[in-house]
């Protein structure tokens, strides 16, 4: 009987877990729809910003060569210092979502160290911060709350210090890493070089835009201000994209957990029925044996 009670208690425990994971899946599904929509609109907006920036940069470049004046285009042959901004979630229970980002960052650190390049980490998200703190790795800056509740202001604060350090020569390169949303069932790691910028990526060929303007003096300042906005929005988009991917990963993880719990309940029910049958058989044998002994 004690064995039956243990199995019944396990069944109830797994069923309670199943209810929790099912509820979390529904919550993640609802949040994913909202985050997916935000990511889609942000992607369109980011493409438009890039288009406008390219057009303005092209026209400015017709008046003066701003590339040589802007520090954002200062590509060094021998890089000595690199800043990596990486985004993870503030919460867990999202499968390998955070692990993939952390693995990518660790691999990048190893590659840079092999080339004698110093790496500084700027961590966005509680899970990434906790991991590297546990590993005893120094973090230059930490940001909690930006990945779970992204805003443009938070993105500005994160990217500003890194860009300032690049402009002031404290670091030679800034890289942004996050796990991005691909579709409802998959995510992909995205690694983007923020600065320095390859001139051909911004100042390329003239677009078909009908925009006409004649820039004022100080062309470099105009372009630098535009690029600063571009950097800020790149950071903001990575936060939104990461959040959508996080909800997608959590929805999957909770769906898998719910299915596993369902399968476990089936196994425990079989074990319970088998144990109950054995118990009944034993009782019948005891009754029959008792009757036989009385004859």
UniProtKB/Swiss-Prot annotation:
InterPro entries per record: ATP_synth_F1_ATPase_gsu, ATP_synth_F1_gsu
GO molecular function, one term: proton-transporting ATP synthase activity, rotational mechanism
Subunit structure: F-type ATPases have 2 components, CF(1) - the catalytic core - and CF(0) - the membrane proton channel. CF(1) has five subunits: alpha(3), beta(3), gamma(1), delta(1), epsilon(1). CF(0) has three main subunits: a, b and c.
Family membership: Belongs to the ATPase gamma chain family.
SUPFAM superfamilies referenced in this protein's UniProt entry, alphabetically: ATP synthase (F1-ATPase), gamma subunit (SSF52943)
Gene Ontology annotations of biological process type: proton motive force-driven plasma membrane ATP synthesis
Entry GO terms, CC: plasma membrane; proton-transporting ATP synthase complex
Domain of life: Bacteria
CDD domains linked: F1-ATPase_gamma
Protein localization: Cell inner membrane
A Pfam family the protein falls into: ATP-synt
Function statement: Produces ATP from ADP in the presence of a proton gradient across the membrane. The gamma chain is believed to be important in regulating ATPase activity and the flow of protons through the CF(0) complex.
Annotated HAMAP family: ATP_synth_gamma_bact (MF_00815)
Membrane-topology annotation of the record: Peripheral membrane protein
Gene name for this UniProt entry: atpG
UniProt keywords, alphabetically: ATP synthesis, Cell inner membrane, Cell membrane, CF(1), Hydrogen ion transport, Ion transport, Membrane, Transport
UniProt-recorded name of the protein: ATP synthase gamma chain
């Amino acid at each position: 009987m004690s064995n039956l009670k243990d199995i019944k208690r396990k069944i109830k425990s797994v069923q309670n877990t199943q209810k929790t994971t099912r509820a979390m899946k529904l919550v993640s599904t609802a949040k994913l729809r909202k985050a997916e929509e935000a990511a889609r609109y942000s992607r369109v907006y980011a493409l438009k910003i890039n288009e406008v920036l390219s057009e303005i940069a092209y026209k400015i470049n017709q008046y003066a060569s701003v590339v040589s004046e802007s520090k954002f285009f200062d590509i060094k042959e021998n890089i000595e210092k690199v800043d990596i901004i990486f985004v993870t979630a503030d919460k867990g229970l999202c499968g390998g979502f955070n692990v993939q980002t952390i693995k990518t960052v660790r691999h990048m650190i190893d590659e840079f160290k092999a080339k004698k390049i110093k790496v500084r980490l700027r961590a966005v998200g509680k899970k990434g911060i906790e991991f590297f703190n546990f590993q005893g790795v120094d973090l230059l800056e930490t940001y909690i709350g930006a990945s779970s509740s992204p805003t443009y202001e938070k993105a500005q604060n994160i990217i500003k210090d890194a860009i300032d350090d690049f402009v002031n020569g404290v670091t030679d390169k800034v890289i942004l890493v996050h796990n991005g949303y691909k579709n409802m069932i998959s995510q992909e790691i995205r690694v983007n070089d923020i600065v320095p910028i390859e001139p051909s990526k911004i100042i390329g060929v003239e677009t078909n835009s009908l925009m006409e303007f004649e820039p004022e003096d100080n062309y470099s300042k105009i372009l630098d201000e535009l690029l600063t906005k571009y950097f800020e929005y790149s950071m903001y988009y990575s936060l939104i994209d990461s959040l959508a991917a996080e909800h997608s990963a959590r929805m999957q993880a909770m769906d898998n957990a719910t299915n596993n719990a369902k399968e476990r309940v089936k196994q425990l029910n079989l074990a319970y029925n088998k144990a109950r049958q054995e118990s009944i058989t034993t009782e019948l044998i005891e009754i029959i044996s008792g009757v036989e002994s009385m004859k």
